[in-house]
Design a protein with these regions (language model features):
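A Trp-anchored, charged/polar loop motif used as the substrate-binding/catalytic surface
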Residues: 149-164, 233-238, 334-353
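Generic structural motif
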Residues: 151, 180, 220, 367-369, ...
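Short, flexible hinge/linker loops that cap or flank conserved catalytic cores
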Residues: 166-169, 206, 242, 275, ...
Length: 443
């Protein structure tokens, strides 16, 4: 797909011609300012409440009059401070409204401040990772809509447009689903610095005849919501593909592995056509049993929320997106999180969802230690995901029914190296070509 995708037609459903990222930035800045004022206000009230409470307690021995002696002072304090904070919030909202009106007058090109440039698109990916659910709730134009991308161009899912954009489309499709805070570009970033990154999709095109498609989506939404959107996207893709689709291989990095598994689960339950074509599901560094960093954030948010003085900080920590919170225990479907408190202390509601009977699954992990069996490597894994979670083989937890040949751990790598490392590609190609050999660089 790289270098061959045509720009989407203006006004088409996928081009989102009405998107105004400048307006979205202004609106988000206004929300941030309002939220900051609210946080300061809550801290002020919590801290000020302590001395008022202490003075009231000290006055109790003198009867009702003594206990109520602080009421006038507190009444005056609360009303003055409320008026000040209300004024600050109104000022912030006014500035945001004025900025939004100015942004609305920009041309379509000028309005796309972020995604028209590669670095900006990556920044938008990070923003969506942390605030995707907030962007959706507020209808913000910065919310990334799911689609197949190649740089600034989005693939239009209509048969004629697909034929023009992908004249060499084949019956074999390789779908790449990025992880948290990423975009399709993360598959091509040279994470090794001095080494050449391997574009798995382009190599699979030349080596095995796959047509690569790179997904871009908002990673701040629930994994189950991204999975639903991916399922719908693939259903349209199969229906409009220029040739009859014979095989689909899914490649998910980190959160992308959960999204891929969730999409297959939902599609199978709904009887979607596309899932019948899936033959391979690859999960690279996917936290099937959860990520320790998100567990730590959960503990921090819960602890900070325990006291009035630190509760505003707890609210900030707990403002993490729904997508991030799903990584705590590897949630894939809505039943995992629906009707549950997302900020409850280390409560796991994950369900075991079935694999596709028609597909082979492959789980790959990494450790920063060259020997993946060393205690340090097993403890911290690739810095974000432990090998036990990447394999779905936790102690006392679920154990996926894998043949050992479908599980690999790479030593001397961090989380992002799995995106385009030569040794990883050789293993992927070997599995897809039916080569049973165990290839180098695995422990």
């Amino acid at each position: 797909m790289h270098g061959t995708m045509a720009a989407p037609a203006a006004g088409s459903a996928v081009s989102r011609a009405d998107v105004n990222e400048a307006r979205g930035l202004v609106e988000l800045a206004g929300q941030a300012a309002t939220g900051l004022v609210g946080t300061v206000r809550d801290m002020h009230r919590a801290i000020a409440g302590r001395p008022f409470w202490a003075l009231s307690l000290a006055g109790k021995p003198f009867g009702p009059v003594g206990a109520a002696s602080t009421v006038p002072a507190r009444f005056l304090h609360d009303h003055i401070s409320s008026a000040v904070y209300k004024g600050l919030r109104s000022a912030g909202s006014g500035v945001a409204s004025a900025g939004g009106a100015a942004a609305a007058s920009l041309t379509r090109q000028d309005a796309r401040l972020l995604t028209r440039r590669p670095a900006g698109a990556l920044a938008a990916g990070v923003l969506n990772g942390f605030l995707g659910d907030l962007l959706e709730e507020s209808g913000n134009d910065l919310l990334t809509q799911i689609g197949f991308h190649d740089g600034p161009h989005q693939l239009e899912l209509e048969r004629r447009a697909l034929g023009e954009a992908l004249p060499a489309a084949t019956p074999r499709i390789a779908v790449f689903v990025h992880g948290l805070c990423g975009t399709e570009a993360t598959w091509r970033v040279n994470w090794w610095g001095t080494r050449d990154a391997v574009d798995y999709g382009q190599r699979l095109r030349s080596d095995l005849g796959y047509t690569p498609l790179y997904v871009r989506y908002s990673t701040g939404l629930h994994v189950s919501e991204a999975a639903r959107a991916l399922s719908e996207l693939l259903e349209r893709t199969v229906a409009e593909w220029p040739v009859e689709v014979g095989e689909i291989a899914l490649f998910g990095h980190s959160m992308g592995g959960l999204v891929s598994r969730g999409a297959c689960y939902r599609a199978a339950a709904e009887g979607s056509t596309w899932v019948e074509k899936v033959r391979h599901v690859f999960c690279l560094g996917t936290p099937h049993l959860g990520a320790p960093l998100e567990k730590a954030a959960n503990v921090a948010g819960w602890t900070l929320s325990a006291l009035p003085e630190t509760r505003p900080f707890g609210a900030i920590v707990n403002r993490r997106s729904a997508g991030i919170k799903d990584l705590r225990y590897g949630y894939c479907c809505a039943e995992d999180w629906r009707d549950c408190d997302p900020d409850a202390l280390l409560e796991c509601h994950r369900r075991d969802i079935p694999f596709l009977e028609t597909a082979s699954y492959y789980f790959l992990g990494a450790t920063i230690t060259r020997d993946s069996q060393r205690p340090l490597g097993r403890l911290i894994g690739d810095l974000l995901v432990r090998p036990s979670s990447a394999w779905g083989q936790g102690l006392g937890g679920r154990h996926y029914p894998f043949e050992i040949e479908r599980l690999r751990t790479y030593g001397g790598m961090h989380h992002m190296h799995l995106l385009n490392h030569p040794a990883v590609y050789e293993q992927l190609r070997g599995w897809l070509s039916g080569d049973p050999r165990e290839l180098p660089a695995a422990a």
